[in-house]
């Protein structure tokens, strides 16, 4: 069975953070947008980040001043547009004189404070770790430290919210739908793309679009070569980053940034109240399918953490791990840690005769919005009369908080729904912001939310995730739309799988 979709201005391939951001920006400008994703939203690298919105302090050592400046500016923008998903976080950097001298750290932090616009976060400052709570959890031998501010984010939810906003601006969103083929064509109106799509049920669709955006992440080179029909000159470097989750290593709300003898840095970040997230590694990979952490990486992270922590961690303390492969533009660097994290665009037009295709290499979650603006700027000659950029001051769904910010929203929710479990209300507030009000509705008792799956996840939220956020499997719900899978028993995860499958079966098939 096959169907023909309406004509589009923009076909976006890939619903990671880059594709989601471009689809949102384009749809908000009034363009007709189709975004397709072979799996689930954020199912690739975007869900496996260190979960930070940051300027990239370490990139200063690699002289990536443009990237750091843009990242610092975008950090402020993302804090405003998704205040329920992004929150300020203070980082403590213990001084290790044999690794980097104090003057170098002060100079780097001075640049970090002044390179980009800072509206909400404080400047860096020095602290005495042995005599203040800033050193909580560290060995008493550490004396001097430096504190600076960045932010943390629920990475997968940020992607989902961008796709939701694209849909609110009339974008056509197709998950579990692969691009089978795409070829250039012409008619009286000019060049365009003719694409064939196939969903997981085997149903094919034909779509046409003026331009194509290849935001396929690790598959970007494959897609580019397939649609152009010739080998790509540019190469991609696959670099695996792995993280471990352990029980909370200190009671403070701050994070640690740890220096290692190999000149790399690793973060220890408070995670979901009960845990600490430790990462990341940088390992060059030949492939990128189903990455997994190695024992060597686990030991690397544990050994570095134990260099600093007063209470050493053992292998048995690791409760969960995750790995993602970053699709970085090959800039010729031999060291995986030195490869640029900046984004690179490649525009193909069949020597100016055919429809345009823009391929996206690299990029960071922090700069996704600016990447989207730059992508549409490059495509402007192929999309005449495109309206002006608009996302800098626009909040994402759920981000329209009251004047008192997230604290006021949480107070309003806990007061109105005082008879509901606090874990449920807090979780909905953090994941959905003001949209939590519509999910909770008139609920007066726990039974009004349907089945309870533990970890603050209820049937009412799952129904919303399936109906409004394209969740189709238990994995979509437990690890991307929420992070409730961590700490949930296998029996309850199985219950979630069964419930989602039952609810998703009732959804109408897209036209």
Each language-model region and where it sits:
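Flavin (primarily FAD) binding-site architecture
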Residues: 214-229
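Core beta-strand elements of the Rossmann-like FAD/NAD(P) dinucleotide-binding domain
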Residues: 6-8, 201-211
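A conserved short coil-to-beta-strand element within the FAD-binding core of flavoproteins
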Residues: 175-193
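Beta1/beta-strand and adjacent pyrophosphate-binding region of the FAD-binding site
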Residues: 4-18
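Glycine-rich FAD pyrophosphate-binding loop
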Residues: 27-48
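Dinucleotide-binding Rossmann-like beta1-alpha1 core, especially the glycine-rich loop
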Residues: 51-135
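C-terminal catalytic lobe of FAD-dependent flavoproteins
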Residues: 141, 149, 155-158, 165, ...
């Amino acid at each position: 069975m096959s169907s023909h979709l309406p004509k589009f201005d923009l076909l976006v391939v890939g619903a990671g953070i880059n594709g989601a951001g471009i689809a949102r920006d384009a749809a908000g400008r009034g363009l007709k947008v189709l975004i397709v994703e072979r799996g689930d939203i954020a199912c690739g690298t975007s869900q496996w980040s260190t979960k930070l919105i940051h300027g990239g302090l370490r990139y200063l050592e690699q002289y990536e001043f443009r990237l750091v400046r843009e990242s610092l500016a975008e950090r402020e923008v993302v804090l405003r547009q998704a205040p329920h998903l992004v929150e300020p976080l203070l980082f403590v950097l213990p001084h290790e004189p044999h690794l980097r001298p104090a003057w170098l750290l002060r100079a780097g932090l001075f640049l970090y404070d002044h390179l980009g616009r800072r509206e909400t976060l404080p400047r860096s400052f020095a602290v005495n770790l042995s005599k203040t709570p800033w050193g909580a959890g560290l060995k008493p031998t550490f004396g001097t430290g430096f504190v600076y501010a960045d932010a943390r984010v629920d990475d997968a939810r940020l992607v989902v919210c961008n796709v939701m906003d694209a849909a609110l601006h009339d974008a056509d969103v197709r998950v579990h739908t692969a691009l089978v083929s795409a070829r250039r064509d012409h008619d009286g109106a000019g060049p365009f793309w003719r694409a064939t799509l196939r969903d997981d049920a085997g149903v094919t669709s034909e779509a046409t679009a003026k331009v194509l955006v290849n935001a396929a992440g690790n598959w970007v080179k494959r897609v580019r070569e397939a649609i152009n029909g010739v080998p790509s000159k540019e190469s991609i470097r696959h670099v695996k980053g792995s993280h471990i989750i352990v029980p909370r290593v200190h009671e403070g709300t701050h994070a640690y940034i740890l220096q290692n003898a190999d000149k790399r840095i690793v973060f220890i970040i408070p995670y979901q109240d009960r845990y600490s997230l430790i990462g990341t590694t940088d390992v060059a990979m030949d492939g990128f399918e189903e990455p997994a952490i190695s024992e060597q990486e686990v030991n690397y992270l544990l050994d570095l953490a134990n260099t600093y922590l007063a209470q050493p961690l053992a292998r048995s303390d690791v409760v969960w791990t995750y790995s993602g492969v970053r699709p970085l533009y090959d800039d010729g660097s031999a060291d995986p840690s030195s490869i640029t994290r900046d984004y690179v665009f490649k525009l193909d037009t069949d020597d100016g005769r055919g429809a345009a295709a823009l391929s996206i290499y690299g990029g960071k979650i922090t700069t996704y919005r600016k990447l989207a603006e730059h992508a549409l700027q490059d495509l402007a000659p192929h999309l005449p009369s495109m309206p002006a950029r608009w996302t800098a001051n626009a909040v994402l769904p759920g981000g329209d908080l009251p004047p008192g910010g997230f604290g006021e929203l949480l107070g309003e929710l806990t007061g109105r729904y005082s008879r509901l479990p606090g874990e449920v209300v807090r979780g909905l507030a953090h994941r959905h912001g003001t949209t939590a009000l519509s999910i909770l509705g008139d609920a007066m008792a726990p039974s009004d939310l349907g089945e309870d799956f533990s970890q603050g996840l209820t049937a009412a939220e799952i129904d919303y995730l399936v109906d409004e956020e394209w969740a189709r499997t238990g994995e979509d719900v437990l690890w991307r739309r929420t992070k409730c899978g961590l700490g949930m028993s296998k029996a309850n995860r199985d219950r979630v799988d069964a419930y989602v499958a039952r609810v998703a079966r009732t959804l109408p098939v897209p036209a």
